[in-house]
Amino acid sequence: PPREGHLVKARYMPDQVMVTGVDEQGTAHHGLLSQPIGSLDLEGMPVVVADLHSSLPAVLAGLRSPDGQEQPRVAYIMTDGGALPLAYSRVVATLSRAGWLAGTITAGQAWGGDIEAVSVHNALLAARHVLRADAAVVIQGPGNLGTETPWGFSGVACGDAINAIATL
């Protein structure tokens, strides 16, 4: 079916998709996210960055409050280092149904989140300012890549996420 929006994800692949991004011109949050660099930040929102998608449940369990207390609003940001469609993650589907996630954001070439973003930077800002998350977790989609060389594994992208957090 035709999709609205102008962001193309999985570009030049036979199954590329067009989505509406939170940061796209003409959308409700474009004005917010188009503020000058330095005028919008994470407002102290804690962010956990991890490499393995399978670590998401453990990270979320660590962020949860004791029973009977209000639970934090946690956003999951899926980067494009693993599988690109969020729907490939049974873990996210289970955690969403359980109410452990305030929302999902797919960044870069990944797609299928509650919110789509062009970059990890805008995904982080959307987590805080659109989803009103108390915390965010940045982890690639399911599946990772490695070549047994010091720099040849998909986990090095965690450094890119940390740089985005430090910048914001």
Task: List each model region and its residues.
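Extended, charged alpha/beta regions that create polyanion-binding interfaces
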Residues: 1-44, 54, 58, 67-75
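Short beta-strand segments
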Residues: 49-51, 77-79, 106-107, 138-141
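The AdoMet/dcAdoMet-binding core of the Class I SAM-like
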Residues: 62
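Conserved P-loop
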Residues: 76-77, 83-91
